[in-house]
């Protein structure tokens, strides 16, 4: 379980200080599907990045399975990201000249896993997202929804405890959005926690819990 305890984050540009997060507290339970809903500039992506270890908080604490991260070094954050977190972003960030199998396999290259095992794990991840018959295709041969599924497979290939998704449906049409949210529900049913940032009420409604964020504060939840 993750506990976010009164976390604040500020960004400084010269003499200007922007309060991105203001004493945010919440618990993220195991095997939960949570949506963070809010407008642009509300702090939702900053919160996601801090939970994922991509950004550092200024005040408060992020507690991982009962352990404070206040004294975490870079290597601790690296280990946390590599073993606990899978990231899905709105932009697919796929390498265009490589097959989707190779794109997913790349996520395992720094893990010390042998090539044959990497390829097998990448294949299984693509099968899990419904792309088992497309593993030798390149990104430009896929639809937007399919490319986002490749990005999800890449996030799943390390078998993370938590999947963090930042506006994953933002570039998709209505049908592809519904299919992607169906997939997230399936992943969540298998036991993985999903935290999804979105500005779409429709997308957020598919989650088991919705956190409403505005001006850097979580002001309501359903």
Locate predicted features:
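H-loop (His-switch) and adjacent beta-strand-loop-beta switch element
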Residues: 210-222
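ABC family nucleotide-binding domain
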Residues: 2-213
């Amino acid at each position: 379980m993750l506990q976010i305890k009164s976390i604040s984050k500020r960004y400084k540009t010269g003499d200007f200080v922007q309060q991105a997060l203001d004493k945010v507290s919440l618990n993220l339970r195991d095997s939960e599907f949570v949506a963070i809903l809010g407008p642009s500039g509300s702090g939702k992506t900053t919160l996601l990045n801090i939970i994922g270890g991509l950004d550092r908080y200024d005040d408060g604490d992020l507690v991982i399975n009962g352990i404070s991260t206040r004294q975490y070094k870079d290597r601790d954050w690296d280990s946390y990201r590599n073993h606990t977190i899978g990231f899905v972003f709105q932009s697919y960030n796929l390498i265009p000249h490589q097959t989707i199998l190779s794109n997913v396999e790349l996520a395992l290259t720094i893990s010390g896993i042998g090539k044959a095992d990497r390829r097998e794990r990448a294949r299984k991840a693509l099968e899990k997202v419904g792309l088992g018959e497309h593993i030798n295709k390149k990104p430009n041969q896929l639809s937007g929804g399919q490319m986002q599924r490749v990005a999800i497979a890449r996030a799943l290939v390390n078998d993370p405890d938590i999947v963090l998704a930042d506006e994953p449906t933002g570039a998709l049409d209505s049908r592809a959005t519904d299919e992607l949210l169906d997939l997230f529900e399936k992943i969540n049913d298998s036991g993985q926690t999903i935290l999804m940032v979105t500005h779409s009420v429709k997308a957020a409604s598919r989650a088991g819990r919705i956190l409403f964020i505005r001006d850097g504060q979580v002001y309501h939840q359903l």
